[in-house]
Regions:
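N-terminal secretory signal peptides and thylakoid transit peptides that target proteins
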Residues: 1-24
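Surface-exposed substrate-engagement region within the catalytic domains
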Residues: 55-61, 130-136, 151-198
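Short hydrophobic/aromatic-enriched beta-strand-loop microsegments
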Residues: 65-70, 198
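Short, structured coil segments at secondary-structure junctions
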Residues: 62-63, 97
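Substrate-binding cleft of extracellular glycoside hydrolase catalytic domains
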Residues: 42, 49-54, 69-153
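A general structural motif
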Residues: 64, 139-143, 176
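C-terminal segment of N-terminal export signals and the immediately downstream linker at the start
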Residues: 5, 27-49
């Protein structure tokens, strides 16, 4: 089954047309796309996916070093996320192809975002992350990344996200894991200032 099978031909063509039209509009206006710059040498790329599961040889042939995989269940209404959660078969396939796998936890999104529950949310979500990470062959001593898949305000960070991350970190450490933070630049910067995550 193709990873793109859920994408209809019509939707694909609409998206492609919009992308092309946007490129011409930016070029005509003299606008260039923003560039990201790494702080050090780029070592390679990893991919993040939830809609389906490509096999390890495909990931390797595309030149990636590995993948970032979800150690969380599909949320209600997201049945299309056939790649959640990661499985032991998938991690073994990637290892057999010389690839690395990083674990990331994200269940809710938007109105149901995990972090919106603050510290109480970590008590629910961290044990699930640990259980699914271990079931997929994830070793101790490695980070489990916690996703903050939003563009939060400083107030949301201070009142909900920081308590969520702090409690999540404490639970992970108590079980022999570390925590990473998978978020936008501002959120990562705030977390670094608070000594949260890697």
């Amino acid at each position: 089954m193709s990873i793109f099978s859920a994408l209809s031909r019509r939707r694909f063509l609409q998206t492609a047309a919009l992308t092309i039209a946007s490129s011409f509009a930016f070029a005509a206006a003299g606008i260039t796309a923003p560039q990201a710059f790494a702080l050090g040498p780029v070592l390679g790329t990893v991919i993040d996916y939830a809609a389906g599961v490509p096999d390890g040889s495909t990931i390797k042939e595309a030149g990636h070093l590995g993948s970032v995989r979800y150690v969380s269940q599909r949320r209600p209404g997201a049945e299309w996320m056939l790649g959640k959660p990661v499985t032991i078969e998938e991690t073994k396939d990637q290892a057999a192809n010389g690839l690395k796998v990083a674990s990331i936890y994200q269940f809710g999104k938007d109105e149901t975002a995990d972090w919106k529950q603050g510290a109480a949310g970590a008590a629910v979500h961290a044990p699930q992350a640990i259980q699914l990470h271990a079931a997929a062959g994830g070793p101790k001593g490695r980070p489990i990344y916690v996703a903050i898949d939003d563009n939060p305000s400083r107030e949301e960070y201070d009142n909900q996200i920081r308590p969520y991350l702090k409690a999540f970190d404490e639970i992970l450490k108590s079980q022999g894991y570390t925590m990473g933070v998978y978020a936008n630049y501002g959120t990562i910067d705030w977390a670094i200032q608070d000594g949260l995550g890697s």
